[in-house]
UniProtKB/Swiss-Prot annotation:
Its EC number is 2.7.2.1. Belongs to the acetokinase family. Mg(2+). Can also accept Mn(2+). PROSITE patterns: ACETATE_KINASE_1, ACETATE_KINASE_2. Homodimer. GO terms for molecular function: acetate kinase activity; ATP binding; magnesium ion binding. Mg(2+) binds at N9, E388. It is found in: Cytoplasm. The keyword Magnesium applies. HAMAP family: Acetate_kinase. One of its GO terms (cellular component) is cytoplasm. This is Acetate kinase. It comes from Corynebacterium jeikeium (strain K411).
Amino acid sequence: MTKYVLVLNSGSSSIKFQVLDPEANATADPFVSGIVEKIGEKKGHIQIQTETSKMEDNRPILSHSVGLERAFGMMTLLGVGPQDLDLVAAGHRVVHGGATFTEPVLIDDEVIEQLKELIPLAPLHNPANIDGIENARALLEHVPHVAVFDTAFFSTLPEHAANYAIKKDIADEYNIRRYGFHGTSHEYVSSKVPDLLGKPAEEVNQITLHLGNGASAAAIRGGEAVDTTMGLTPLAGLVMGTRSGDIDPGIIFHLARSGGMTVDQADKLLNRESGLKGMAGVNDFRELKTLIEDGDENAQLAYDVYIHALRRFIGSYMLILGGVDAIVFTAGVGENAVQVRRDAMADLQNFGIEIDDARNENSEGIVGAREISTDDSTVKVFVVPTNEELAIARQATELAEQQ
């Protein structure tokens, strides 16, 4: 009998989940996928998708617990309820593990209390993650629950990369350092590269580029992260869909003094109203492309700023690593935006990087990892589809089976 893992990602107004076979091929569809969204709004939405059927519910959803319980009930009606499956674990994505959690952990009451202590580090994400964990534990009491942290992969950062140049006692008191995010994705795709190159993992230097609505880059040496663009929070680094990425911190002081902006207003500005959306009015790359084709100058400038930031970090990481064997594009934009890949890698022949336009463009129908660099390119460029849910399922299974 196939053993399954329930993987949950609980957000502020939604819950996404999948039921997966942790031993399945990376390109296999999940056994069950579901979403609970618009929690707390007048009209909610729950959708459950199996290999053969789909069910939807548009009634109001008062809370996360109500939504998850209703979703499990719908799964039961489809014959794939949690009680019908041999669930070996429930894996929970948790955005911030701070310095406390540097690897997946089996969840108990003490772990939940420790997670609550980390809320100041991720006030936008961790409360919803914790809510999802508590609701799932209440509904699935006899299933081992495992937390997998976005930050864990970056616990290997050297001290000179992890620390900020601010007063040490303040940094220590408030746990201020570079934690990094998207770690599950960076770890997953980077683990595929040694086989693509035919080299031992410990000999591979690579730059991984997770480009979605949120975006981050990582420098990885011998399978361990040595630098990454996101920092204390997911706001730092690359230009993103709605986040500014790196800016001069003095901008915030200027807005506070000259414009009377509050901390909460600045938070909203930089996290939700900046990036591509702030500059061009849209954060979807397909819409941005349409605006550019229509001659929108703001959209073109937003795109140029995005590419400039991306190339700046790629160049920086090449120097930090002392040369690279591979550059990897992943996530929604990284996997699908042909022009972003082309422009990010343009005119780098002097650094041993050369894109094959045909390979870059003619990727429709190709499943799995693929090379988009030329045969003569000494630095290989790959597109590697990420699968964070499968990675979480495998890590949760491994830990649960050790108990």
